[in-house]
A protein has these predicted regions:
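Second-shell loop/turn segments in exported
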Residues: 19-24, 38-48, 65-66, 99-109, ...
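Sec-exported extracytoplasmic/periplasmic mature domains
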Residues: 35-43, 58, 62-66, 117-128, ...
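Active-site-adjacent substrate-binding region
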Residues: 42, 173, 180-279
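Acidic/histidine-rich catalytic neighborhood of metal-dependent amide-processing enzymes
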Residues: 103-204, 221
């Protein structure tokens, strides 16, 4: 879940497009990891299911490791080391605790799979001498039971708040992947996202043939895992299609996803990171 701040809602229109013209990001492998996550069932922060998933994911990231989050939670992090400041590619890997049975195909699993596959892609594609690139899967993005919407930023976003507090001085930018694989994916700029970094993302998307997935315009501002970074003065963007009609429902399942949509996001983000990380 991310919290929309617009009184009129955050919906939009759908459309259909293909994947990217580049062939660096493997959406088939990413969808296999989505299926693995969904097979675990609901995966709220602190649950045995999320613990098992974290143990699986840490082995998939370069220099994979856990970083502690208050409350007994843990972020999963990896690094392709280089000179700073670091580029961070992030997503949350927990799911909502309610409703019972929620599996978060787009809200959690898709972004997680995209980050893991981007790590594989960039490990192959980045040139020698590249900037430090980090991959972080945030725990505790979803609000714990009893957290009112008015306090979402204070009691949710636990992993991203912890990571930003621990590493802010080392970071150059954050690229956050949230709802990034739904059918009809459209990603206008989210209202809190850094406009200059977003403009570079749109240029990268055009270069790999997926400009239609990133239309001009702006979504309302959303409280999501990028906000702790913005508050720390770090440019950050949030890739989230808040028109996704199955958000926060039991219908957020694998059949609502589109491999071409995730491929478009993966190719665009890979292009952006390669451009920014190349000396």
């Amino acid at each position: 879940m991310a919290l929309c701040l617009a009184a009129s809602g955050c919906g939009g229109e759908e459309g259909e497009d293909g994947g990217g013209e580049a062939d660096r990001f493997d959406s088939t492998a990413a969808f296999e990891l989505i299926d693995e996550q969904l097979a675990l069932g609901q995966r709220p922060a602190g649950s045995p299911q999320l613990r098992r998933l974290g143990d699986r994911l840490v082995a998939e990231l370069p220099q994979g490791r856990f970083e502690p989050v208050p409350g007994g939670l843990r972020n999963v992090a990896g690094t392709l080391p280089g000179p700073g400041p670091a580029i961070v590619i992030g997503a949350h890997y927990d799911t909502e605790a309610q409703p019972p049975g929620f599996v978060g195909a787009n809200d959690g699993a898709a972004g997680t799979a995209a980050v893991v596959e981007l790590a594989r892609t960039l490990e192959r594609e980045l040139p020698d001498g590249h900037r430090d690139v980090r991959f972080v899967l945030f725990d505790g993005e979803e609000e714990p039971p009893g957290c009112p919407d008015a306090r979402f930023e204070q009691c949710a976003l636990r992993g991203s708040r912890a990571y930003a507090a621990a590493h802010a001085g080392e970071l150059g930018e954050l690229i956050l992947l949230d709802y990034v694989a739904n059918r009809g994916l459209r990603l206008p700029r989210e209202g809190n996202s850094d406009p200059d970094l977003w403009a570079e993302l749109r240029e990268a998307a055009a270069a790999v043939g997926v400009a239609d997935r990133f239309p001009e315009g702006r979504q309302p501002p959303i409280i999501d895992d990028h906000v702790p970074f913005l508050r720390a003065g770090i440019p950050a963007i949030d890739l989230i299609d808040f028109s996704y009609e199955h958000a926060d429902t039991l219908e957020d399942t694998a059949d609502k996803l589109d491999p071409d949509a995730l491929d478009a996001v993966g190719e665009a983000v890979a292009e952006l990171v390669i451009r920014r990380a190349t000396p």
